[in-house]
Amino acid sequence: MKWIVVVSVLALVSPAMAQVTLKPALAPLNFLVGNWKGDDGKVADTGGTSKGGSVISAQSDGNALLRVDHTELFDKAGKPAGGFHQTMLIYPDNGAIRAEYVDGEGHAIHYVASEIVAGKSVTFSSPPKEFPLFRLRYELQAPGTLAVSFSMVPPGQTEFRPIADGTLHKSR
C-alpha cells in the first residue's frame, strides 16, 4: 500500500518539477537557470563579506525568470552582521528584457534596460535619469560558474562604484 501512495505522489509532483522551456525572448538567459551557491562575496561599503545562494527558475510557462536569494553578511572580522532575502523577476516587455528587484531591507530597483550576450552574460540597468543609478551584471565564467557584480552611481556623481561582487557555483 505504501508504494501506491509514493507512486501517486511522485506522479503528481513530477510535472511540477519538470524543466520549463524559456520563451524565445528569454532563451539567451537560460544560463542563469539553476540552484547557485555563493563563495565569499565582497561588500565594498563595509569591507566585509557576504555568503548565500540563489535559485533562478523559469516561471509563468517560460515567460519569466524568478530569482530568489538569501544573503548573510559578515563584518571585517568575519562576525555575522545580519542577512536578508531578495527576489527578482526578469521578463520581456515590448521587445526589451526588464527586471524588478525587491529585498528584505525594503529596497526596490526597477531595471529598465539590459545588455545580453546570449548564453554568456547579462547586464541590467536602472533608468538613466534617476539617481542613484544601479547596474547588476551576471557573467558565465565557465560552465557552472557565474560572476555577479552590483554597482551604483550615487546622486551627484558620474562614476559607477562597486557595492558587492562574488562568484556563484551551480549546485544542481
Question: Model regions: which residues?
Answer:
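Hydrophobic small-molecule pocket/channel-lining residues, especially in calycin-type beta-barrels
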Residues: 18-172
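N-terminal signal peptide c-region/cleavage motif recognized by signal peptidases
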Residues: 13-15
